[in-house]
Regions:
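A short alpha/beta connector and helix-capping loop motif
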Residues: 4-7, 23-48
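A short linear-motif detector with a strong N-terminal bias
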Residues: 25-26, 51-53, 130-131
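A cross-domain feature marking catalytic cores of carbohydrate-active enzymes
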Residues: 14, 48-51, 127
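Short coil/turn segments at secondary-structure boundaries
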Residues: 23, 50-51, 74-77
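N-terminal nucleotide-binding beta1-loop-alpha1 segment
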Residues: 7-14
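Active-site-adjacent betaalpha module
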Residues: 1-5, 42, 55-179
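Short, solvent-exposed loop/turn segments at secondary-structure boundaries
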Residues: 21-25, 135-137
C-alpha cells in the first residue's frame, strides 16, 4: 500500500510535440495534470524530467504552470536514472516509493521505472497517466514492468490509497479533482 509520507511523484517527458504525438494524448495530458494537482494537494515530493527540451520543447503548459517551485531536470539518456541530478533529486525526496507518469511508456518511463526498481525503490506506474505512440507499446511496457515487480495503479486508485480515510483533511481536495 502506498503511504502519503513515503511516496513521491516522478514526471517523465510530458513535452511539446512528443506529448501531442502519443496515443490518446488529450486524456494523457488531462490525467497527468490531475495527478500533479493531487500530488501537490497531498504534499508529495515531485521529481520532474525533460528529454532534450531544446529539441522536444518544454513540458506542456497545463503541467508546467502547476510547478513554479520546481525545476525540470534536463536529460539526454532514456532512463532518467542515468542523469546524476535526477538521482540526487530522488535521494533528496526522502521517500522509498514513487508513482511514475509520462511518456513514452515503452522507452523513458519503462527504463526509468525499471532502474528505480533495481535500486530498491517501490515503483508504481500510473497506467492512465502514461502513453506511447501506439497502444501496443504502452501495453508492452506495462506488462514488462509488472514482470519486473513494478506495480500498476490508476489515477483514482493511487489517490484513494494515499488518502485512506474519508475523514482525512486531504480527502475533499482529492475528491474535487476526480469528480
Amino acid at each position: 500500500m502506498l503511504e502519503k509520507n513515503n511516496t513521491g511523484l516522478i514526471i517523465i517527458d510530458v513535452q511539446g510535440k512528443l506529448a501531442h504525438s502519443v496515443h490518446e494524448n488529450e486524456a494523457l495530458i488531462a490525467n497527468c495534470t490531475t495527478l500533479v494537482k493531487g500530488a501537490l494537494a497531498l504534499d508529495l515530493p515531485i521529481v520532474w524530467a525533460e528529454q532534450i527540451p531544446q529539441k522536444l520543447g518544454a513540458t506542456v503548459p497545463q503541467i508546467n504552470s502547476l510547478l513554479p517551485d520546481h525545476q525540470p531536470i534536463d536529460k539526454f539518456t532514456f532512463s532518467a536514472c542515468d542523469e546524476p541530478r535526477f538521482l540526487d533529486a530522488i535521494k533528496s525526496a526522502g521517500v522509498d516509493s514513487f508513482l511514475i507518469c509520462g511518456i513514452e511508456a515503452h522507452i523513458c518511463v519503462y527504463q526509468t521505472a525499471a532502474m528505480l526498481k533495481g535500486m530498491g525503490f517501490n515503483v508504481e506506474v500510473v497506467t492512465d497517466c502514461v502513453s506511447s505512440r501506439t497502444p501496443e507499446n504502452k501495453a508492452l511496457a506495462i506488462n514488462k514492468l509488472n514482470r519486473l515487480g513494478v506495480q500498476s495503479t490508476g489515477l483514482e486508485m493511487c489517490f484513494y490509497e494515499l488518502v485512506k480515510d474519508s475523514r482525512s483533511n486531504s480527502f475533499k481536495p482529492i475528491l474535487n479533482l476526480i469528480k
